[in-house]
Amino acid sequence: MKANAGEVYTVYNQYLKRYTACQVAYIAPPDTVSKESWAVVLSLDWVGDAPLTAEELPHLRPLYKDFMYWSRDLHLLRVPLEVPPQYTLVGTLPPFTDQPCRSYGGWSDGYDVYLQIRWQAAPEKRRRAFKEAMESDGETEIGGIPVKVSNHRVMDQYAPFDSALELKALPCLSELICQRWHPDLLEFLRGNPFISELTLLNHGQRTLDLRGTSIRKLMLDMTGLEELWLCEGTEQLLFQNKGLDACTIHAPEDGSGLTLQFIGEYCPHTELPNLRGLHGIELKDFDLTGLAAVHPHLKELRLWGAPGNLQNFSAVGAFRELTNLSTFDLFGFGADDIPTPEQMPELRWF
């Protein structure tokens, strides 16, 4: 089905686990990027537990993208005219905009809309303070070290704070790198909706509960850690030490939204049967036997060698839901080990 100007579509957003909507604002002519016309798609400010209905069309408004460090603007994207099957046509409205669009891509998977809706859920006072801090030329002190109020990243190695609560002086902080444990770190993280990236090394903890935080990307030293609880929105967990861990990882929906990255060796995490993605780096010898039984719903498998060898590569054929598969600097397999399209019906990128 080809898109037409004014058409409104609804689609399930895998990140929000709810339905969202968009409008084809206009059809753009061919340009230097493509000889084909483009559909310019506008995200709409609507979220629902069920698909959008025609009765709701008159109440729709455009979605403005201004989350985190983005300047406020309509969320527009040039996409191919062919509408993906997961998008359902609801009806037609007069186009909301004819604003020029210079961003290109495929029909959105909804990630930017998810981040915008998540941003709008934060208290308005906090969002306003974030934007003001972004533009500020002022300074404050963290651990006795002068730091710009506009800083979005702090490393305790260079700003050696004792109490993590000192970081409240940085309203647009979004990334924290800790080389040691801070007793009130969890209190600070649970009170800040904008800390999305955390690196935690040499923490000395046996258990770590990050529920109630907003961390999307976690770089974690697994040494000595026995039990880990991830928050609702954690998308990436990157181990920071080589070798096998001995940790039980608790993730929402048994890891359905989580990608895990290990270094060198992997201890199969049977408690994550729904794990979405698995990345391995610095591999010397890695055996794929039995991995699909541990993570049967894996969507992405990416492996990097040191360089190294892969054993039993043909075992990837057991990942029936895999969409993305890649290996780099890894050897030990041949053409006969490559799975057939029938074995991996969902594979889109290899």
Name these PLM-found stretches.
Residues 30-43:
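Short, solvent-exposed secondary-structure boundary/capping segments
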